[in-house]
Amino acid sequence: MNKDEVVVSLFAGAGGFSSGFSQAGLKPLFGAEINADACQTYQENVGSPCHQLDLSTVDPSHIEMLTGGKRPFVVIGGPPCQGFSTAGPRNFADPRNLLIFNYLNIVERLSPRWLIFENVEGLLTSGGGRDLARLVREFVDMGYSVRLQKVNLAAYGVPQTRKRVLIIGNRLGIDFQFPEELYSFDSGKAKKASGKPLAPSLAEAVAGLGPAASDKDALVPYASSEPVNAFDARMRAGNRVEVVTHHVRVEAAERMQVELLKPGQTMKDLPPELWHESYRRRANRRVSDGTPTEKRGGAPSGIKRLHGNLQSLTITGPAAREFIHPTEHRPLTIRECARIQTFPDKYRWVGNNASVIQQIGNAVPPLAAERLAKHLRDIDGSFGADTRPAGAMSAKLLGFVLTEALGMSPALKSTEALLAEMHQGGFVF
């Protein structure tokens, strides 16, 4: 990496975003992450320091010091953003706002050439759309020309339908587009037939792994000496020991229910008398504090059997308990979840099983991150230089895509109206 191409990873987690950037030749100078296990996992794999920091309170000047005073090419990562749309300008009185406002202060202090912000789909409608609109307004006021898009990462080759909100911005005053989508996808729930080849299926993602072990410390050999498909080859690359960890069979608590489920079915497809008690309790639970979540506060579906010939549903922390293998009566193993998230088999995980699956579920898939990193290199005409091209425009919201569906919910329409107003030069807090 050129000495001028500084990458900083905030909210770095276990290093998924950073690993993908490293694969594209843009290894971060450092990561910053509050969780000790995730920070150590990052260091074990990314090959650059991870500073265990509380980004809600750290002084932005400290982050600037860690860069050696160099202006970054890009800052990657994103904090939770709930509840800050009604706060005053960078007002830290509400503790929920500490992370997002200090994140913005850090970005402003570092003044990177590019930024990539990633968050869950629920951010689209958080605070009636004003949380997202406020965030975009902050970036524009800092001098960034930004595009916002809800992206399904399966379109970039990830073997799961993982919807994420991405904001990409630059200080060059240039327009740009998101990376071209390379794949169609179908998880049985989310689907897009674009005429392009299907993204790798769940079965393709876990192919080549040997039978799951019962011993929690087992080193499990591959099912064959050679990779069985292109995705398996990518996952095996660099794993010199020819065995994998975290490929351990765990019996489902709801064994009888699991055996009755067909691919694509969930607990709610079973007769109510077979519902597990924990599912009954959770079915009545809602998120009450406005925090954007995977399911936007909706009721969970409990266990679900996945389709082997389709892409997986979104891998999150509970996946190793709730996602049932397509053909075996057991949940997915942690290793299978890691592969579906495109973490290679050589990746070394730090922490107990609960910590590891949470790290995996929280991560940006390295394969998607690599695609984004390569795209930045392609669209940045004078890569790494601190110059503005001739004809540069003023900072603005360049465009946004909230959904590809034909209809919109009332909540999403509210967000669209706010962003449309901003796109036309309005919307001031």
From Swiss-Prot:
Example of a GO MF term: DNA (cytosine-5-)-methyltransferase activity
Entry annotation: catalytic residues: 81
Reactions catalysed according to its record: a 2'-deoxycytidine in DNA + S-adenosyl-L-methionine = a 5-methyl-2'-deoxycytidine in DNA + S-adenosyl-L-homocysteine + H(+)
Keywords from the UniProt entry: DNA-binding, Methyltransferase, Restriction system, S-adenosyl-L-methionine, Transferase
EC numbers on record: 2.1.1.37
Ranges where the record places region Disordered: 282-305
GO biological process: DNA restriction-modification system; methylation; negative regulation of gene expression via chromosomal CpG island methylation
Top-level EC class: transferase
InterPro entries listed in its UniProt record: C5-Methyltransferase, C5_MeTfrase, SAM-dependent_MTases_sf
Domain SAM-dependent MTase C5-type residues, every copy: 5-383
Pfam family, one: DNA_methylase
Biased composition, class Basic and acidic residues, residue ranges: 282-297
Superkingdom of the source species: Bacteria
UniProt entry tagged with the keyword DNA-binding: yes
DNA-binding recorded as keyword: yes
Transmembrane segments: none
Family affiliation: Belongs to the class I-like SAM-binding methyltransferase superfamily. C5-methyltransferase family.
Protein name: Type II methyltransferase M.ApaLI
Organism per entry: Acetobacter pasteurianus
